[in-house]
């Protein structure tokens, strides 16, 4: 029994270190400290909540992230909440940049579809590309902002 506890001790210590690193990452994210996030990220690799650390790190520097970095994150954490949240953030940035090709390519993979601003960008793309009349939907989304 004592041997089992002794063997498990390093695993518990590693888990505790990962927990501490994640808490530090959460604080760094709230402060906007992207350098600290990047420094802490290797310490959470393999942790059950690694996706959160990776999300915070990439989200903090999203405006300078490359499309390749985005794709690597989206592939590595496919199917997770963090994957779709970062996709939401990326779609917003692509819309702000008026990167309609990138936006249109990524939009079908967006599962939650819970962001009104992303929906407005999607309607703009739809209108420009097909000439569809989207005025009623845009108006509905515009007025819904007051209720949010």
Kindly give the residue locations of the regions a language model identified.
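Alpha-helical solenoid repeat scaffolds
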Residues: 12-148
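Sec-dependent N-terminal signal peptides
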Residues: 1-6
């Amino acid at each position: 029994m004592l041997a089992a506890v002794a063997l498990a001790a390093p695993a518990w210590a590693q888990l505790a270190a990962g927990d501490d690193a994640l808490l530090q990452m959460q604080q760094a994210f709230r402060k906007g400290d992207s350098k600290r996030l990047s420094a802490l990220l290797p310490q959470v690799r393999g942790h059950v909540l690694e996706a959160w650390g990776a999300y915070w790190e990439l989200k903090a520097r999203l405006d300078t992230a490359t499309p390749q970095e985005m794709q690597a994150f989206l592939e590595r954490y496919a199917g997770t909440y963090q994957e779709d949240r970062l996709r939401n953030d990326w779609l917003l940035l692509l819309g702000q940049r008026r990167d309609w090709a990138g936006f249109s390519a990524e939009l079908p993979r967006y599962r939650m579809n819970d962001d009104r601003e992303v929906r407005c960008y999607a309607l703009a793309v739809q209108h420009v590309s097909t000439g569809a009349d989207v005025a009623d939907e845009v108006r509905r989304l515009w007025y819904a902002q007051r209720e949010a």
